[in-house]
Amino acid sequence: MSATETKYVPRLYKKYKEEVVPILQKKFNYKSPMQIPRLQKIVVNMGVGEAVQDIRQLERAVEDLRAITGQQPVITRARKSEAGFKLRKGMPIGCKVTLRKERMWDFLDKLISVALPRVKDFKGLSPRSFDGRGNYAFGIAEQIVFPEIDYDKVDRIRGMDIIINTTAETDEEAFWLLSLLGLPIRSM
């Protein structure tokens, strides 16, 4: 890479480094910069229960998830058999993507600025969705809130779970980190 070329830096990562880090450092009195919470990964999971009867449903879900995240999803399989759901161990039942680095920051930016504002009757994310270890999980009921999904080509509405994994020690630290990044979480 020559001196004139600039490396791509995601907009939200730049905001994290320039604005969020100093605020968190001051608020929680961290001694070392390595103590400051940061994002580790974002996992986007789409459970497709209909895949048991119709495998094409899973293929369409994989296509949707690939379009939304820009990364090839991995198919998740049943861990154990469940007669009530006509499910056998090893059957495909969903797909997921683990995003890290630039793709993670780009996805979070798109989620905050485009997808969540398009959710009907959206009043902010619940502050109760923290897990006690600084991670945050929530669900989106419709994949059509993402701009990559063509509304006319959607065969059925599918939801997804989004898990944001941080290095924060407590829920309060994670709340401040995600709120300062712009995630619309209702106050605790």
UniProtKB/Swiss-Prot annotation:
Task: Spell out the family assignment given in the record's similarity comment.
Answer: Belongs to the universal ribosomal protein uL5 family.
- Keywords, comma-separated and alphabetical: Ribonucleoprotein, Ribosomal protein, RNA-binding, rRNA-binding, tRNA-binding
InterPro entries (alphabetical): Ribosomal_uL5, Ribosomal_uL5_bac-type, Ribosomal_uL5_C, Ribosomal_uL5_CS, Ribosomal_uL5_dom_sf, Ribosomal_uL5_N
**Underlying gene:** rplE
A GO BP term, please? translation
| Keyword RNA-binding carried by entry | yes
What superkingdom heads the lineage?
A: Bacteria
UniProt xrefs under SUPFAM superfamilies: RL5-like
Query: Where is it found, in Gene Ontology cellular component terms?
Result: cytosolic large ribosomal subunit
The answer to keyword tRNA-binding applying to this record is yes
Q: Which PROSITE patterns match?
A: RIBOSOMAL_L5
Subunit details for this protein? Part of the 50S ribosomal subunit; part of the 5S rRNA/L5/L18/L25 subcomplex. Contacts the 5S rRNA and the P site tRNA. Forms a bridge to the 30S subunit in the 70S ribosome.
Q: What is this protein called?
A: Large ribosomal subunit protein uL5
PANTHER family named in the record: 60S RIBOSOMAL PROTEIN L11-RELATED
GO MF terms held by the record: RNA binding; rRNA binding; structural constituent of ribosome; tRNA binding
| Function description | This is one of the proteins that bind and probably mediate the attachment of the 5S RNA into the large ribosomal subunit, where it forms part of the central protuberance. In the 70S ribosome it contacts protein S13 of the 30S subunit (bridge B1b), connecting the 2 subunits; this bridge is implicated in subunit movement. Contacts the P site tRNA; the 5S rRNA and some of its associated proteins might help stabilize positioning of ribosome-bound tRNAs.
Q: Do you know which Gene3D superfamilies this protein is assigned to? A: 3.30.1440.10
